[in-house]
């Protein structure tokens, strides 16, 4: 695992929580553990502000992968989860997916995330 990611989530991991795999795409990261999924959203110009979110494995409902077309620069991953509440333009709350844009050159890593999410959270 990337040492920077490991450092950023070390304080959040439980004693018996193990990292399955971690991925970084541009500045943001996703970390899969035996307990669930962490997302690290790097914010600001300096990148010193990082929002860490955790989604328990039991809240993960589905995953989608959208491939890049000829003119796209990235592929999209969306993980549907309960508890990631957002408000739409009409003021109505909904469960927003965890959403990542992945550079086309890292598409294989994105496919690996799909496999790991299915294996560890959706096949139980």
Tell me what each language-model feature is.
Residues 38, 43-51, 84-95:
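Acidic Ser/Thr/Pro-rich low-complexity disordered segments
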Residues 1-32, 94-96, 103-113:
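Anionic N-terminal interaction surfaces
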Residues 47, 70-72, 117:
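Hydrophobic alpha-helical segments
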Residues 21-49:
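Conserved beta-hairpin
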Residues 37-38, 50-68, 78-82:
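Phosphoinositide-dependent membrane-docking surfaces
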Residues 118-124:
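Long, non-globular regulatory segments flanking folded domains
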Residues 5-11, 51, 65-66, 86-88:
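Intrinsically disordered, low-complexity boundary segments flanking structured domains
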């Amino acid at each position: 695992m990337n040492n920077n990611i490991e450092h950023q989530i070390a304080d959040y991991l439980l004693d018996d929580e193990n990292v399955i795999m971690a991925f970084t795409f541009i500045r943001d990261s996703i970390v899969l553990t035996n307990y669930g999924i962490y997302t690290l959203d790097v914010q600001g110009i300096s990148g010193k502000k990082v929002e860490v979110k955790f989604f328990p494995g039991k809240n993960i409902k589905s995953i989608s992968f959208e491939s890049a077309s000829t003119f796209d620069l990235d592929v999209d991953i969306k993980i549907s989860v309960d508890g990631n509440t957002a408000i739409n333009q009409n003021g109505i709350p909904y469960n927003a997916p965890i959403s990542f844009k992945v550079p086309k050159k890292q598409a294989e890593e994105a496919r690996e995330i799909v496999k790991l999410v299915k294996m560890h959270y959706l096949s139980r």
